[in-house]
Regions:
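Alpha-helical transmembrane segments
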Residues: 2-16, 20-207
Length: 207
């Protein structure tokens, strides 16, 4: 698998974020597994070790369908063991379908799908907790891709105590405010106060 194995391992991050809302991770697994099966059949991907190429995504889909009702009802959640397992299974299915390029493209698509499914909750989180006002879809995407303790650790290592001020409209649209949000910066409050995009209606429109 080579470099593709890194992408497969990185699938764990967005699936972790998806699993923080009941039903979100299950929806992502069902949608992406079904798409992978369909694409594999249409393209006619060759069997791997005499096993049909659609076997991995089909097994992933069937397993998730059996579990999903309890997840949607909020009675249980995948947890780290569950969402990590589904993440790796999806990644392997992506690799079988399209190699490195296919894995990269579907990794991005999966991250975007999670950002879309969780858009309301993520927007509330960015506004209330990180004070990123009027968050763009790029901010949501970057939160799914780099949010959590591991992402913050890398920010601390790379940025130290610096907090980058992002005021370019293109970079804001691409989510660079979330990407460079450094919770370890002593200048964070001053940077937030300078955000010219602050709107009092941000919270009300999400209710």
């Amino acid at each position: 698998m080579g470099l593709s194995s890194i992408l497969v391992a990185l699938m764990i991050q967005p699936m972790n974020i998806a699993d923080m809302q009941p039903g979100s991770a299950a929806s992502v697994v069902i949608i992406m597994s079904f798409f992978t099966i369909l694409a594999t059949v249409i393209i006619g991907v060759a069997p791997v070790a005499q096993i049909p190429a659609y076997y991995v995504p089909l097994l992933t889909l069937v397993t998730c369908l059996g579990y999903a009702p309890l997840d949607y009802s909020g009675k249980i959640m995948m947890g780290e063991v569950g969402n990590h397992t589904f993440a790796i299974a999806l990644g392997i299915g992506f690799y079988i379908l399209g190699g490195f390029v296919g894995t990269l493209i579907l990794f991005i698509v999966t991250t975007a799908l999670i950002a879309y499914i969780r858009r309301n909750n993520l927007s509330r989180f960015l506004i209330n907790k990180l004070h990123i006002n009027n968050p763009t879809f790029g901010d949501l995407f970057m939160d799914v891709l780099t949010g959590g303790g591991l992402g913050d650790l890398f920010r601390k290592i790379i940025l130290g105590e610096r907090q980058q001020v992002i005021d370019d409209n293109l970079l804001i649209a691409l989510g660079f405010r979330r990407l460079f949000y450094n919770p370890y910066s002593p200048n964070l409050e001053r940077v937030v106060e300078k955000d010219v995009r602050t709107k009092p209606a941000d919270l009300r429109r999400l209710n």
